[in-house]
């Protein structure tokens, strides 16, 4: 008979299963934070705002997609879908502004 590996102390196997999305979310957050820290600041507040906000929104999109894929709350999944819709539009607006102000 084969048995699953024991869950870490304090976690049920079901919680471990659910945690997959959380692990991915933390990796996405760390990647985004690392990217923002490596970004070259121009000294132009408007340009820096646009670049940092775009990166911030891209992280939000990644997290929202993970919520939709792994989350269980209908309320949070609905919020994640709204975030994807709204912030995708805002990224396009930021891109358009940056294109006009190279």
Regions flagged by a language model, labelled:
Residues 1-102:
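His/Met- and acidic-residue-enriched segments that coordinate or traffic transition-metal cofactors
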């Amino acid at each position: 008979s084969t048995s699953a590996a024991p869950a870490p102390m304090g976690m049920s196997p079901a919680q471990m299963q659910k945690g997959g999305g959380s692990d991915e979310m933390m990796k996405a957050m760390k990647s985004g934070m690392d990217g923002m820290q490596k970004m070259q600041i121009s000294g132009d507040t408007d340009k820096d705002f646009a670049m940092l906000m775009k990166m911030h929104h891209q992280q939000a999109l990644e997290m929202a997609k993970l919520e939709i894929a792994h989350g269980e709350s209908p309320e949070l999944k609905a919020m994640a879908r709204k975030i994807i819709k709204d912030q995708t539009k805002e990224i396009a607006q930021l891109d358009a502004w940056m294109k006009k102000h190279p």
